[in-house]
């Protein structure tokens, strides 16, 4: 029985860190675009109603999809290219302190006595229960991130409601280090500027990754064996 229990505990511990073991030696993977809309169901993107069709007028320069008449056409169809401007300057400072104290005292007593036909019984009892808990927690997070880049993205799909799914990547190699920038998300055509550009904060379900591969990244990462032990050992 004990052996079976130990085996079940070991299997549960390994299954809990199975996902992390797949990322040993790799960067954390991004979730698919659209997974944050309907509980991870990416097919929800195609359930939006289609916009009403605009009447087509021959020999007309106006297009309802283009809100500007005297500017160059913007990305609207599959295969079109637009520029994404990424300018991130985030700073976060969180500090949390929590103190909790609780004391409880419980007392119980009883007295029992009886007499019948020269027989008597008598008894007394008392009990006490004391408990005390004290919890103190203190945490602080400081983070500062700055990133300013431009990357070209291509329209990979047009959703039924007219929104565009885009994806793009950029690779730059400097000596023995390769820098990789990827962008993916959902864009509303009306948010695309006159210069066929869009800021990153206008991209829904944005997935932005900026990392690298090469000698510097290999030195910064712990050894594979150390990463495996960090995920498997429970202490």
UniProtKB/Swiss-Prot annotation:
Transmembrane segments: none
Lipidation (S-diacylglycerol cysteine): 17
The keyword Signal is annotated on this UniProt entry: yes
Keyword annotations from UniProtKB, A to Z: Bacterial flagellum, Cell outer membrane, Lipoprotein, Membrane, Palmitate, Signal
Membrane topology according to the record: Lipid-anchor
Residues with lipid group (N-palmitoyl cysteine): 17
Protein location: Cell outer membrane; Bacterial flagellum basal body
Predominant location category: membrane
A Gene Ontology BP annotation from the UniProt entry: bacterial-type flagellum-dependent cell motility
Entry similarity comment: Belongs to the FlgH family.
Purpose of the protein: Assembles around the rod to form the L-ring and probably protects the motor/basal body from shearing forces during rotation.
UniProt xrefs under NCBIfam families: PRK00249.1-5 (NF001305)
Subunit structure: The basal body constitutes a major portion of the flagellar organelle and consists of four rings (L,P,S, and M) mounted on a central rod.
Protein name: Flagellar L-ring protein
Organism: Mesorhizobium japonicum (strain LMG 29417 / CECT 9101 / MAFF 303099) (Mesorhizobium loti (strain MAFF 303099))
């Amino acid at each position: 029985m004990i052996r079976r229990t130990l085996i079940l505990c070991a299997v549960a511990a390994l299954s809990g860190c199975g996902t992390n073991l797949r990322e040993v030696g790799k960067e954390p993977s991004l979730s698919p675009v659209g997974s944050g809309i309907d509980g991870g169901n990416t097919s929800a993107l195609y359930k939006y109603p289609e916009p009403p069709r605009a009447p087509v007028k021959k020999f007309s320069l106006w297009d309802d999809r283009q809100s500007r008449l005297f500017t160059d056409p913007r990305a609207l169809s599959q295969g079109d290219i637009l520029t994404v401007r990424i300018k991130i300057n985030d700073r976060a400072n969180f500090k949390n302190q929590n103190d909790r104290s609780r004391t409880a005292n419980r007392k119980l007593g009883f007295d029992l006595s009886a007499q019948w036909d020269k027989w008597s019984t008598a008894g007394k009892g008392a009990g006490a229960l004391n408990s005390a808990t004290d919890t103190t927690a203190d945490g602080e997070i400081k983070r500062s991130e700055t990133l300013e880049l431009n990357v070209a993205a291509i329209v990979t799909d047009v959703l039924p409601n007219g929104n565009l799914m885009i994806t793009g990547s950029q690779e730059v190699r400097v000596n023995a280090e390769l820098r990789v920038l990827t962008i993916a998300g959902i864009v509303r055509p009306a948010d695309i500027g006159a210069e066929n550009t869009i800021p990153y904060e206008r991209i829904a379900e944005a997935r932005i990754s900026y990392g690298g591969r090469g000698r510097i990244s290999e030195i910064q990462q712990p050894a594979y064996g150390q990463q495996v032990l960090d995920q498997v050992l429970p202490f």
